[in-house]
Amino acid sequence: MKVKTSLSTLILILFLTGCKVDLYTGISQKEGNEMLALLRQEGLSADKEPDKDGKIKLLVEESDVAQAIDILKRKGYPHESFSTLQDVFPKDGLISSPIEELARLNYAKAQEISRTLSEIDGVLVARVHVVLPEEQNNKGKKGVAASASVFIKHAADIQFDTYIPQIKQLVNNSIEGLAYDRISVILVPSVDVRQSSHLPRNTSILSIQVSEESKGHLIGLLSLLILLLPVTNLAQYFWLQRKK
């Protein structure tokens, strides 16, 4: 009886220590798969499960939550959710002035451009800010011309300087009345460098982080402990019987 109780307790402990918790919920299939692949490449034990509305959720070992969030954050995950034209111009929205309508339209365009730029390989964060021209005042003086600023944070191991003309052209063609020379692009490389393939990988066994080379040794040690547990219980049982 004691042996069975001890084994049941051990199995329960091992089961609880190996449980996974939600890391992110309500993410798209595409982004979820990218995040899952990234976590596994970094040596973390991660899984995905179906979520509401066709979305998925990511699960990791509870002890890996902080590390997983840090890894994904440094790689720009999860991506920002950008507004669409439908969000900016709801069907039941109130009537706005022409200036307000133009401002909302350009904001929606800036959001769409940011979304497009974020799809480029290596882009971690993309922002587009548009400044609208002022109306002509009563004295007949012209206001400041429209301008746009593009901010891109990218992976440090990718050169983005050659993309600047294409980025400016994309913004120029998307915003009406915006001159090419009134567009500025700021590129900021991330301090994080992509992990090289020759670096050692870690894996998680029962919430214990070990290298791939040490995984077999840990499994062997745990197996030995499981085998020794009933042996020690039997030895204790026979010793108590002899004392009686």
UniProtKB/Swiss-Prot annotation:
The family database entries (PROSITE patterns) matched by this protein are listed as: PROKAR_LIPOPROTEIN
The family assignment reads: Belongs to the YscJ lipoprotein family.
Q: Tell me the first and last residues of the signal peptide.
A: 1-18
| Any Pfam family the entry gives | YscJ_FliF
Protein known as: Yop proteins translocation lipoprotein J
How is the protein disposed in the membrane? Lipid-anchor
The record's function comment reads: Required for the export process of the Yop proteins.
Q: Which GO terms describe its cellular component?
A: cell outer membrane
Give the positions of lipid attachment, kind S-diacylglycerol cysteine.
C19
Q: Which domain of life is it from?
A: Bacteria
Chief localization: membrane
Q: What induces it?
A: At 37 degrees Celsius in the absence of calcium.
Intracellular or extracellular location(s): Cell outer membrane
Residue positions bearing lipid (N-palmitoyl cysteine): C19
Q: Which UniProt keywords apply?
A: Cell outer membrane, Lipoprotein, Membrane, Palmitate, Plasmid, Protein transport, Signal, Transmembrane, Transmembrane helix, Transport, Virulence
List this protein's GO terms for biological process.
protein secretion
**Protein source organism:** Yersinia pseudotuberculosis serotype I (strain IP32953)
